[in-house]
Amino acid sequence: MTELKVKTEKVEKQLTRELLKPVLKTPKEKIDNSGKFYATGKRKNAIARVWLKVGKGKIVVNKKTIDQYFPSETYVKTILQPFVLTKTIDQYDVICTVRGGGISGQKGAILHGISKALDKSAPDFHAILRKGGLLTRDSRVVERKKYGQRKARKKTQFSKR
């Protein structure tokens, strides 16, 4: 009987410890006292440096608002995808600088950077972002042109006779 009581007491202590643990895990990395999270995102030839901080949902790209920087509304919607998946659409401000590549590559780099920064801010988002495929770097780049051909894969017209 005493062994049973000892075992139940141990189990109860373990359960109370588990219940007292915080629900959200503590953030992995912070870069300064103001609570900014930093990440870099890459896509094609574009590299984006992203700073994420708790705020009202403002997004600034190269010192311009997101609507000024990206002309198409579909680009803006895809950049907001990590916030929609994690249900934090108006909880973070984003400041990012992006260089290289074209508009599509820059959009992909910013998306990747925001996803990585969100993952650093709250590790609970990791599974959601991973399932959405936002933490994986899209490694597709332009194939190089080969000599003796017109393009990367296009060849000159072949004649049998």
From Swiss-Prot:
Q: Name one GO molecular function term.
A: RNA binding
GO biological process per UniProt: translation
User: One of this protein's Pfam families, by short name?
Assistant: Ribosomal_S9
Tell me yes or no: is Ribosomal protein among this UniProt entry's keywords.
yes
InterPro entries hit by this protein: Ribosomal_Su5_D2-typ_SF, Ribosomal_uS9, Ribosomal_uS9_bac/plastid, Ribosomal_uS9_CS, Ribsml_uS5_D2-typ_fold_subgr
| Alphabetically ordered keywords of this record | Ribonucleoprotein, Ribosomal protein
Name the domain of life this protein comes from. Bacteria
A GO cellular component annotation here is:
cytosolic small ribosomal subunit
Which family is this sequence assigned to? Belongs to the universal ribosomal protein uS9 family.
Its recorded name reads: Small ribosomal subunit protein uS9
Q: Which organism is it from?
A: Rickettsia felis (strain ATCC VR-1525 / URRWXCal2) (Rickettsia azadi)
Gene for this chain: rpsI
